[in-house]
Amino acid sequence: MGMRMMFTVFLLVVLATTVVSFTSDSAFDSRNVAANDKVSDMIALTARRTCCSRPTCRMEYPELCGGRR
């Protein structure tokens, strides 16, 4: 193969890798959003349980435990 042909093959490989990487990142990002939502929900639930089990915290943040101010 000549130098020009090798350079063309190199460019095609780089382009193909870029396209595959870009589409994989988009799919990965949407999965990350769902995972981050689950983690946020778990953190909120843990904080709520911890706070509601302590009287001083429950009085300070009644909206977490279903109470009103």
UniProtKB/Swiss-Prot annotation:
UniProt record similarity statement: Belongs to the conotoxin A superfamily.
Positions of disulphide bridges: C51-C57, C52-C65
Annotated region (Ser-Xaa-Pro motif, crucial for potent interaction with nAChR), positions in chain: 53-55
Top-level taxon: Eukaryota
Cellular component GO terms, alphabetical: extracellular region; host cell postsynaptic membrane
Modification sites for 4-carboxyglutamate: E60, E63
Tissue: Expressed by the venom duct.
Domain notes: The cysteine framework is I (CC-C-C). Alpha4/7 pattern.
PTM characteristics: Occurs in 2 forms which differ in the post-translational modification of Glu-60. In form SrA1 Glu-60 is 4-carboxyglutamate while in form SrA2 Glu-60 is unmodified.
InterPro entries: Conotoxin_a-typ, Conotoxin_a-typ_CS
Keyword Cell inner membrane appears in the UniProt entry: no
Keyword Signal found: yes
UniProt function note: Alpha-conotoxins act on postsynaptic membranes, they bind to the nicotinic acetylcholine receptors (nAChR) and thus inhibit them. Has weak blocking effects on muscle nAChR composed of alpha-1/beta-1/gamma/delta subunits and the central nervous system nAChR composed of alpha-4/beta-2 subunits. Does not detectably affect the peripheral nervous system nAChR composed of alpha-3/beta-4 subunits.
Keywords associated with the record: Acetylcholine receptor inhibiting toxin, Amidation, Disulfide bond, Gamma-carboxyglutamic acid, Hydroxylation, Ion channel impairing toxin, Neurotoxin, Postsynaptic neurotoxin, Secreted, Signal, Toxin
Modified residues (Glycine amide): G66
Pfam families tied to this protein: Toxin_8
Propeptide: 22-48
Protein name per the record: Alpha-conotoxin SrIA/SrIB
